[in-house]
């Protein structure tokens, strides 16, 4: 089975495929596994995954990666699943942007919202200092200890980063181009207590010494008055978009950016399944939850196992009865 997507649902599907004695190949367009857990909110706590009263998103991702690797799958990151072709013997060939070509009987699409691409301001110096002081998310809170931080944005993520970093940073300043915030009211009130906030302000320029950020120029978008701030880091948190690449051209039945599946997680293409945030399941409310995606992944893998081997059972039993698989 080829699993497209290395986020939490793809990782769990990889584990479950191994549990069902299926060889798995994971293809992910990001440069690391973990999906949104590591790309968007690694330092935030996830509360709605069974068995964890609360766990850092990054830690949950690492646990899922460890679990996924239990049955030694092949993993290819920073690689797009670009095209699929049907063969005369009813197999699929998946071609990637790196020249890879993989033949498989089944495909599970767990691509989430697609490759996550941060929205950029294109301010002067922004690209030059990307990853040298300009960031679009917070991977590790400790990287910002003792630093003077400027956050750009007015949504939940921007406000949450201000609250998260204020205990460890030397200072936190947040600018927003309006005076109304698209964040939880309570969080906004807390932010004003721990950060310096400039409303009606935007980022004009990021300055540095060539290797790191040293200053940011902001301006009042009503008066055009400029201020130069001494900063060590600029976090631009104005949203992101998901890129599905050429997947939209594969002939899948889609509703908007979602792939339509039935109760068995089957798409309209034989041997192709989907699970997680990317699916729109017929007759079922869409819940964009990790917990929901886990169940969908298990169903998809189990149905795919039966498709590969008609003599196989859809339900192979409980993992607690499979100690031999885990004690090798």
Swiss-Prot record:
Pfam families: Pyr_redox_2. Gene3D superfamilies: FAD/NAD(P)-binding domain (3.50.50.60). Binds 1 FAD per subunit. Keywords: FAD, Flavoprotein, NADP, Oxidoreductase. It comes from the Archaea. It catalyses: 2 reduced [2Fe-2S]-[ferredoxin] + NADP(+) + H(+) = 2 oxidized [2Fe-2S]-[ferredoxin] + NADPH. FAD binds at residues 28, 36, 41, 81, 116, 277, 320. Belongs to the ferredoxin--NADP reductase type 2 family. Homodimer. This is Ferredoxin--NADP reductase 1.
């Amino acid at each position: 089975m080829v699993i497209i997507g290395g986020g939490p649902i793809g990782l769990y599907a990889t584990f479950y495929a191994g549990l069902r004695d299926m060889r798995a190949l994971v293809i992910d367009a990001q440069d690391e596994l973990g999906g949104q857990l590591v790309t968007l909110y690694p330092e935030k706590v996830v509360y709605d995954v069974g068995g964890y009263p609360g766990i850092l998103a990054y830690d949950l991702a690492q646990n899922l990666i460890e679990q996924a690797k239990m049955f030694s799958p092949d993993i290819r990151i920073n690689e797009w699943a670009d095209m699929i072709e049907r063969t005369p013997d009813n197999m699929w060939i998946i071609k990637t942007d790196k020249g890879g070509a993989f033949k498989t009987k089944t495909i599970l699409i767990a691509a989430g919202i697609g490759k996550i691409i941060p929205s950029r301001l294109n301010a002067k110096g922004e690209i030059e200092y990307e990853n040298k002081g300009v960031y679009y998310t917070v991977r590790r809170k400790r990287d910002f200890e003792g630093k003077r931080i400027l956050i750009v944005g007015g949504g939940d993520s921007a406000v949450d980063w201000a609250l998260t970093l204020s205990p460890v940073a030397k200072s936190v300043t947040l600018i927003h181009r309006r005076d109304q915030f698209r964040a939880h009211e309570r969080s906004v009130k807390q932010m004003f207590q721990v950060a310096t906030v400039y409303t009606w302000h935007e980022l004009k320029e990021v300055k540095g010494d060539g290797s790191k950020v040293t200053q940011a120029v902001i301006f009042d978008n009503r008066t055009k008055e400029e201020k130069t701030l001494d900063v060590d880091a600029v976090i631009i948190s104005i949203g992101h978009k998901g890129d599905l690449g050429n997947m939209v051209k594969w002939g899948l039945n889609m509703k908007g950016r979602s792939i339509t599946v039935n109760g068995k997680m089957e798409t309209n293409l034989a041997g192709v399944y989907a699970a997680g945030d990317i699916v729109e399941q017929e007759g079922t409310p869409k819940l964009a939850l990790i917990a929901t995606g886990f169940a969908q992944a298990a169903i998809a893998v189990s149905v795919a196992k039966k498709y590969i081997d008609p003599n196989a059972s859809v339900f192979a039993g409980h993992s607690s009865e499979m100690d031999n698989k885990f004690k090798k």
